[in-house]
Amino acid sequence: MAKKSKIAKAKKQQAMIAKYAPIRQALKEAGDYEGLSKLPKDAHPSRLKLRDQTDGRPRGYMRKFGMSRIRFRELAHQGLIPGVKKASW
């Protein structure tokens, strides 16, 4: 489980990215790079660290499922992820 402060920071950052996305796009199309540099640093999408939706784990993140490899394995073994089953050959 990640620290609650890190999870809260990630949520705040996602909100900021969504808020500034149209402004950022308009400035990029206009070629106003000075205006872009005046936007908050955390408003840039590349600064966001993807985290597990259930417990906030930052590493081992699987984009397709939105969770960490550990949580994915637990839920897959329980059969809670549709279309996923343990490989056997």
Curated annotation (Swiss-Prot):
Molecular function per GO: rRNA binding; structural constituent of ribosome
Region (Disordered): 38-61
BP-aspect Gene Ontology terms: translation
InterPro entries the UniProt entry points to: Ribosomal_uS14 (IPR001209), Ribosomal_uS14_bac/plastid (IPR023036), Ribosomal_uS14_sf (IPR043140)
Keywords noted in UniProt: Ribonucleoprotein, Ribosomal protein, RNA-binding, rRNA-binding
Keyword presence, Methyltransferase: no
Pfam families, alphabetized: Ribosomal_S14
Disulfides per UniProt: none
Top-level taxon: Bacteria
GO cellular component assignments: cytoplasm; small ribosomal subunit
Feature: compositional bias, Basic and acidic residues: 39-58
Signal sequence region: none
UniProt subunit comment: Part of the 30S ribosomal subunit. Contacts proteins S3 and S10.
Functional note: Binds 16S rRNA, required for the assembly of 30S particles and may also be responsible for determining the conformation of the 16S rRNA at the A site.
Entry-linked HAMAP family: Ribosomal_uS14_1 (MF_00537)
Protein family (similarity comment): Belongs to the universal ribosomal protein uS14 family.
Protein's UniProt name: Small ribosomal subunit protein uS14B
